[in-house]
Amino acid sequence: MIKDAVNTETVEVNPVDQVRSTIYQLLSSLFAKEIDHKILHDLTSEQAQQFWAQLGSEAEFKADVDVLVAELAKLNTDKALLELAADYCGLFLVGTKYSASPYASLYLDDKPAKKGDEPLLFGEQHQQMTQFLKQSQLQVQSEFPEPADHLAVILAYVAHLCTHSDEAEQHSFIKANLANWLGNFVAKVTEVDTGNFYQALARLTYSWVKSDAEWLESELN
C-alpha cells in the first residue's frame, strides 16, 4: 500500500504497538483491493483464525468479527469470490450515488456540492496526505493508482505511525484525519451495501479506530 521511499533504520517496537500496527495494516489491505484466492487463504489460515478469535474476544468488536469470519467461510467457490469482488467494485470503485467512495475529501469538504458536480479527487486532503507520507519518507505504491486520501492509504499510514512515532502524534493524526469522517463513511456503506462483508468491515474499522484513539488518549493522560 505504502512503502519506504528511502531506506530507514529498523526501530525497536513494543508488542502492543506491533499488534496495533498489524490490525491497521489488515484493515488497510481489505479496503485496498478485492479478496482473491491468496488473500482468502491468508484470512482463513490457522494463524488468521487465532487472530480473529482474539480480536473478537473484545465485546465491542465481536459482532462484526463474527460476520466477517462467517462471510469468509462462504467464499468456497469462484462464483462467491466474484460476487464479493462485484460488491467491492460497486461500493468503492464506481463513483455513483449507490457507492461509498473511500476518500476522506468527499466527507471532509465543507463546500456543498452543486447538483451534477463531480466529486473533487486529488484535492486538498490528497495533497495533505501526500505531504504526511513525504515527511515520513514514504510513498504510495505505484500499483495503487488512487488518491492518497483513500481510506486504505490512511490506515496503512497509521500502521506505520504505530511503530515509528510517539503516542501524541498518533492520537493527533487519527483524530484529525480518520476519526472525524469515518462515521459518515460507515453510514454510507451501510446504506448502499447489499451484502454483509463490507458493512461489517466498515463498522469494525470504525469501532477499532475509536477504541484505539480512546486508548491513546488514556495513555497520554
Curated annotation (Swiss-Prot):
Keywords: Chaperone, Cytoplasm. One of its GO terms (cellular component) is cytoplasm. SUPFAM superfamilies: TorD-like. Coiled coil: none annotated. It holds the Pfam family Nitrate_red_del. NCBIfam families: PRK04976.1. PANTHER family: CHAPERONE PROTEIN TORD, CHAPERONE PROTEIN YCDY. Belongs to the TorD/DmsD family. TorD subfamily. It comes from the Bacteria. GO terms for biological process: protein complex oligomerization; protein folding. It is found in: Cytoplasm. Involved in the biogenesis of TorA. Acts on TorA before the insertion of the molybdenum cofactor and, as a result, probably favors a conformation of the apoenzyme that is competent for acquiring the cofactor. The gene is torD. Its main location: cytoplasm. This is Chaperone protein TorD.
